[in-house]
Amino acid sequence: MARQVEILGEMFAFVDFGETSFFDLPCVYLMAHEQADQIHIHYAGQTARLKARYAGHHQLAAAKSLGATHALILVAPDARDRREFETLLRWHFRPPLNLEEVPTHMQAWRAAMHCGKHDVALRAKAAHLGQAQPVQASVFTQSRIVRG
């Protein structure tokens, strides 16, 4: 089994950038690298075909210059599911290479409800009501790594 990491309750697989051309799958993906026991997230996206998307990705060179070495992928066949989960990832991590505005707390709430992520929806709602600061750094400790 390939290495995996749990992110927002889902298991993402580690895929070296050089191997993305072998994955002709619909997925949500993160451009990332590991340093010590942390994973640094540089970009979050979604695509109907990973192989085609990575071939000429507009942020791949920038991600590599920041140290990114691999993609973290979650296969997601449904287009709406991919878009909503990408919204959650951009809200949660605020990756520095995503040029779009960070989703609002209510956009994150709607995306979380669609994806069945009620704990994330509660955080987004609390942030919207001014009860919490949801800012999550684009770096996290990989406490739930599954190594195969």
Which positions does each model-derived feature cover?
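Boundary/linker segments flanking structured domains
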Residues: M1-H42, Q46-G148
